[in-house]
């Protein structure tokens, strides 16, 4: 239903929380890290070229990992007392965004990069 925003956003969120806990962060800092990571995947299209989970999927997952590390570092250096956005609100927003997105941007290979990159590429 949510495509890449959900797949990569949720995995990045979980990784950010786990890393924060592993580095000695509090539970509230872990929630903050999860929120930060997920928030920055909202609205991401899911447009695999040729319907294959290669391009741009591999790079997007790599960027999700980097976002998880960055989110963890931000949360560890911040106080959850000052957070304006909660993980619950971001999860709700992701659900609403997924429902609002056009179907062709949800892993159909009918929009975005899938539409504009030729299938004849050897790399694909």
Report each predicted region and the residues it spans:
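Functionally critical mobile loop/hinge segments
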Residues: 8-124
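Cysteine-centered functional microenvironments
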Residues: 1-4
